[in-house]
């Protein structure tokens, strides 16, 4: 971990719905992500509907909730990681600590390959992934759709990165 930074990950529960809505509603925290759930009941339903392969965690710094991260496992021994932190924790080594812990969890699960996606304008995330030897695979487009099929404002250009474990 970064010197002086010790974060903990604990499983996301339905009791975290209000925190998750606050995180998703923070314009700076969510600006690089596709459309986020900002309705409390919808967030609770999403958390309740998580599948066993979807490992979602609350990021804690000194017992304070500072973000959320995920390790979503596929059937082919691969997984995708992701994370979001409140802006006041950016640039302090917290993202590095989160990625380190996700990599360790992936190793413990015998994951052979990891992917991560980020907005092409999120230079901090791109630098962080590169620091951990993730290689850029491609640049594409994520289209955020509502339940009725209409495009949401969260559509954006993304870069996908891959790391062989």
Language-model features and meaning:
Residues 25, 48-51, 107-108:
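Residue-level signal for alpha-helix termini/capping positions
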Residues 36-55:
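Active-site rim helix/loop that mediates acceptor-substrate recognition in acyltransferases
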Residues 22-36:
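Helix-loop element at the rim of GNAT/NAT acetyltransferase active sites that forms part
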Residues 1-18, 23, 59-165:
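Acyl-donor (CoA/ACP) binding surface of acyl/acetyltransferases
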Residues 17, 28-29, 52-56, 111:
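Generic structural signal for secondary-structure transition and capping sites
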């Amino acid at each position: 971990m970064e010197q002086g930074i010790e974060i903990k990950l604990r499983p996301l529960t339905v009791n975290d719905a209000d925190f998750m809505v606050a995180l998703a509603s923070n314009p700076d925290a969510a600006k690089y992500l596709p459309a986020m759930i900002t309705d409390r009941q919808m967030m609770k339903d999403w958390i309740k509907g998580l599948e066993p392969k979807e490992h979602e965690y609350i990021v804690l710094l000194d017992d304070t909730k500072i973000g959320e991260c995920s390790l979503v496992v596929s059937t082919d021994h691969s997984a995708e990681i992701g994370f979001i932190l409140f802006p006041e924790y950016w640039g302090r080594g917290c993202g590095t600590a989160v990625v380190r812990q996700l990599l360790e969890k992936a190793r413990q699960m015998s994951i052979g390959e990891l992917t991560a996606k980020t907005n092409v304008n999120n230079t901090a995330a791109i630098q962080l992934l590169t620091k951990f030897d993730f290689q850029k695979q491609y640049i594409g487009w994520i289209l955020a759709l509502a339940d009725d099929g209409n495009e949401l404002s969260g559509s954006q250009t993304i870069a996908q990165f891959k790391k062989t474990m």
